Amino acid sequence: MDEGVNLVFPKKVIDGTAIKRLISRLIDHFGMAHTSHILDQVKTLGFQQATATSISLGIDDLLTIPSKGWLVQDAEQQSLSLEKHHHYGNVHAVEKLRQSIEVWYATSEYLRQEMNPNFRMTDPFNPVHIMSFSGARGNASQVHQLVGMRGLMSDPQGQMIDLPIQSNLREGLSLTEYIISCYGARKGVVDTAVRTSDAGYLTRRLVEVVQHIVVRRTDCGTLRGISVSPRRMPERIFIQTLIGRVLADDIYIGSRCIAIRNQDIGIGLVNRFITFRIQPISIRTPFTCRSTSWICRLCYGRSPTHGDLVELGEAVGIIAGQSIGEPGTQLTLRTFHTGGVFTGGTAEHVRAPSNGKIKFNFNEALVHPARTRHGHPALLCSMDLDVTIESEDILHNLTIPPKSFLLVQNNQYVESEQVIAEICAGTSTFHFKERVRKHIYSDSEGEMHWSTDVYHAPEFTYSNVHLLPKTSHLWILSGGSCRSRGAPFSLHKDQDQMNPRSTERERRYLSSLSANNDQIRYKFFSSSFSGKKKDDRSPGYSEMNRIICTLPCNLIYPSILRENSDLLAKRRRNRLVIPVQSSQEREKELIPHSGISIELPINGIFRKKSILAFFDDPRYRTKSSGITQYETMGMHSIVKKEGLVDYRGINEFKPKYQMTIDRFFFIPEEVHILPESSSIMVRNNSLIGVDTRIALNTRSRAGGLVRVERKKRGIALQIFSGTIHFPGETDKISWDSGILIPPGTGKRNSKESKKWKNGIYVQRITPTKKKHFVLFRPVVTYEIADGLNLARLFPPDLCQEKDNMQLQIVNYIVYGNGKPIREISDTSIQLVRTWFILNWDQGKKSASAEAAHASFVEVRAKGLIRDFLRIDLVKSPILDPRKRNDPSGSGLISDNVSDHTNINPFYSKPKMKQSPRQNHGTIRTLLNQNKECPSLMILSASNCFRMGPFNDVKSQNVIKESIKKDAIIQIRNSIGPLGTALQVVNFDSFYYFITHNQVLLTKYLQVENLKQTFQVLQYYLMDESGRIYNPDPRSNIVLNSFNLSWYFLPHNNYENSCEEISTIVSLGQFICENGCIAKNGPYLRSGQVLIVRLDSVVIRSAKPYLATPGATVHGHYGEILYDGDTVVTFLYEKSRSGDITQGLPKVEQVLEVRSVDSISVNLEKRVENWNEHITRILGFPWGFLIGAELTIVQSRISLVNKIQKVYRSQGVQIHNRHIEIIVRQITSKVLVSEDGMSNVFLPRELIGLLRAERTGRALEESICYKAFLLGITRTSLNTQSFISEASFQETARVLAKAALRGRIDWLKGLKENVVIGGMIPVGTGFKGLVHCSKQHKSIPKNKHFFEGEIRDILFHHRELFDSCISKNFHDTPEQSFRVFNDS
């Protein structure tokens, strides 16, 4: 350099990138030798300055970032909020995990970005800062772990551990953080060891594929090129792609040529291209070279070492293999501290440019509601959405890209920098996604419910795997489980109350039944109505009865079992219908079957004179409308008795009429209720015949007199059958409105008396003021037998009195005297119903019995199911305090040895030292997969809690007054939701006192002295739909967990947490935690409403699990799940760790052409379409050739992009031509297909594409083939040299095959010459090689003909070709190519 030149003195920090640029400029200007001399001087200068500075590195140089404290605190706050939402059931586990990762990843990234400015401002000459940011040693992420935070770690499987390490290595780690850090560090160490060997093996395989690729020619004469457009890629990548390449075509600007074909591209030419914005530029690449087993200089381009065209004889294949493999080795060794640290991508956000109101087109075709990846409600854009933000003085227009989430509502006010949309992650990041299954396990045992429909997955039709069609909650209702393994049936039934330890005693009972059966009160009766002997019985059933009869003080009635097992009693939840047939019915078989319906109340409690069952006699049924009459008016006697009213399962008496006479009369008539708008085709008081049209769609069933009346709801049209009589002066008939003349009261010999032998009903009709006539209507007489034969309906055992139990029979006319009866849609009307009333005397045994508890007991034996009705007299402990702890009370299982379970858990024996909540509960029988051993679930007090009281004087007074007004209104018992636990005995007592209130709580429980404090509570009033209105939303909530203590909430605790709304609580409703039931108190737990009272609700605690569509639910509805069982499985996408140790397997997958999850089928379909159309247009020889060409070009570009993506994401720059040489080898084969059989090649034989083309031209016939991708390993074993193949793998097999086939090795590559010790045909050894073949000179015509045709097809129709090819070149398409597995 001349010393006299005025040198510029730039004051800039020179980093690694600047040094690279400087060196390349120096080489361009001064050449290699002078540049190396300059660089030696730079090196010496650097060492001198470093020695003079004497930088040392100490622990004090690690400066923690000041903003770290509040950043971490903010992230913790978000994590806590997220945990709450997950607990409430607002987000599911995957959304929580995903958001947690992104919160901590964003915090860690922000700290990393803060690090450099912090060093620059506080300490620019910090040794750590100088070392890492100059690129000498360590990078930003490594220093970030020293002074920022260590962040999220990966476990050895590459999965993320969701507990972040908040400390950095300068501060030191806590014990937990250290253990998590060890996971990641272990992964880093293992990766360094394992992946290094992997990288080395990858390099060996790559070199094996391309070791024979040598530059042996200057120009192959190809006319093809690949288009590169500056508009389709970033400028930096465009420059990297073009520099060092050779143009395949002339470049024009207008009519002026600025570059010619076969000219190599330097930096000046690239800048000119960028300046002039040239249209797509066609360049030569290794893909376009027409040489079979080598490459020409122009297709390769410049040598990266000296910046000129590559020399002949250069081993570019080995250089390419080393260039790709070596960075992997280097990067695995360069892990430093970052081993195992998780890196992922966060979503991009669109922010509002200013304050204002946001507006967009709210159209269902454009946006629809959805959930974001974090479970937040949002609007999903299906296509580009234009958004306008109106501020005071300016309008901002934004475009939201498709598949983005809009986080604001239409016309909402947004603030500046507020996030208004989230762009779908993955469109702009290089991180790999993988589909992962996430199993969610139950953390408590309980019963499974779901709040939506599910359907079977097609592959699991007969199992318990279901798919969710929409977002919903899964609920695990709490309850302790106990499995009965001892016997195939259990004595416990649904809703029984039990002690959990009693199941053990049950097994002892079953095994040690005493043989002394005489002491057991036991009877067994014939299972049919016919008079069989009592001895004719099944031994299996007697054994069953014995077991059940061992329970003291219980009445057990066997149900009626027919000889035909098809007519077993139909059992519903709380109802048993016993089929009944009289002997007459058996003979005639005309009357339809009827049955005795035994219906138990929901809680199973009967008070005195309650209705146990009813029987509808088919003789008292009619199918027509009409009027009932008891004799002539005033002539019948009626005795007032206690009638009945049906409430929610409790039937009790109220004053009604009970018949004491032996017959009643029914006057039939036909009634039609028509709407007001209908047109009536008959007149009032006219006579019609049978099947006369009376309205548009209505015809009469009987003839007679028509009466038309207008009513509120429409038009009532009555048809009275009978005869019309015009009375003369001699007829003495009373002018009352209607008279019933019983049979036998008229004139004996008259025609009318013979005609109306059943009696007549006389009715006076006055159509006009003057005329009148009398209508004689026929009457149906019903005779009532003298009492019902009980033996015909029940077994004899049921008719006998036991323990002062009585069964009374009452016939009850359903309709009152003279009341009209209307039929409803062809259903039969029951006129008389027979009631069976349960009663008992106030004898010695049952003096204090206020109620009876009834339940159905189902016993299975020998494949038959038998239902028993069990009735227990319940003794009220309040009315008889001396017998409160009497062990002989009515329990499920009791003996003298073990302690006894009373009906009410709060009156246990003083000896019991455990608290009642652990010992007592209501039993629930649940579905189990093993049908022989049913599972039992015990619902005890610890699984439920009470919320209340909701105190408001006004609303309570209103309800009290309404109860006073109508004394009939009973307190309704709680109805169960969806077949779940209908009643919890601990709260819903078995006792009904005079006030109809109940014992709720024992205030004190002492072992020596048992004291009870009772609180009288009332219920809500419920309407028919089962909904309950909460009258006071402003009151407090008290949580009573039934562990004998109260929890009070202060009145002003939640002042503004809930709005003033009236909450409607319905039974069976699921309530999420933190929902509002009262103004100043949210729900304290999630659960299901079991009981609703006036001032409180009882909720069975439950755990909600949110599940989104496509999740897989394990288990059936109502099934017991144990702790640790799988509840639901999610399928979701997650980012892989972005470490090169994770990237290398990805490169290997692509190069070995193994199938990857993300490969799509789009390209494959497109290629098939091309093949079809091109073959149809051009005929077979050209069709296969061009179809295979297009497929191979597409797959090559896609492969190059995939491999570059991995390395660029790590900051590693590899020139495209190295990758192209490798990819060219693995895509150079085609597969001969079977449909076009050729004499030359075998079906499914692998041949080179160029060989296939030449053979086709020579034979002038079509060879059918398709493109095929080989992995690098299979390519190494499919070369022309068997010596090279044998030196790589499977030596014995390869040599044996080669010997048998008589293969010849032409020793063209490096490896085979090394093996046999010959001269390597590279470098100086290349000059002695003859590379001109006579064969090429012998067919010049065919060659020119073929090339001309290709040029015409591919370049004169350039629009088609360029649009297909250039679109995919050097961008990052998601779609890939069809791959063929090695197998």
From Swiss-Prot:
Function statement: DNA-dependent RNA polymerase catalyzes the transcription of DNA into RNA using the four ribonucleoside triphosphates as substrates.
Keywords: Chloroplast, DNA-directed RNA polymerase, Metal-binding, Nucleotidyltransferase, Plastid, Transcription, Transferase, Zinc
Keyword Nucleotidyltransferase attributed: yes
Protein location: Plastid, Chloroplast
Pfam families: RNA_pol_Rpb1_4, RNA_pol_Rpb1_5
InterPro entries in alphabetical order: DNA-dir_RpoC2_beta_pp (IPR012756), RNA_pol_beta''_euk (IPR050254), RNA_pol_Rpb1_3_sf (IPR042102), RNA_pol_Rpb1_4 (IPR007083), RNA_pol_Rpb1_5 (IPR007081), Rpb1_funnel_sf (IPR038120)
UniProt name for this protein: DNA-directed RNA polymerase subunit beta''
GO terms of biological process kind: DNA-templated transcription
